[in-house]
């Protein structure tokens, strides 16, 4: 299966708890951290919920 790289670009400070949990679920906990995950509909959905906090890196 294809991989996707995600970089945290925004701070979770002053964000709703649900958005913080999505970041933790994606494995992101520090600014500018990059993780590589399987490209699944679940991961794409999580990214779609917090586009202001993450960016997809090629």
Curated annotation (Swiss-Prot):
Protein name (database record): Large ribosomal subunit protein uL30
The encoding gene: rpmD
UniProt xrefs under InterPro entries: Ribo_uL30_ferredoxin-like_sf, Ribosomal_uL30_bac-type, Ribosomal_uL30_ferredoxin-like
GO cellular component entries: cytosolic large ribosomal subunit
Molecular function per GO: structural constituent of ribosome
Keywords, in A-Z order: Ribonucleoprotein, Ribosomal protein
Subunit annotation: Part of the 50S ribosomal subunit.
Family to which the UniProt record says this protein belongs: Belongs to the universal ribosomal protein uL30 family.
PANTHER family linked: LARGE RIBOSOMAL SUBUNIT PROTEIN UL30M, MITOCHONDRIAL RIBOSOMAL PROTEIN L30
GO biological process: translation
Domain of life: Bacteria
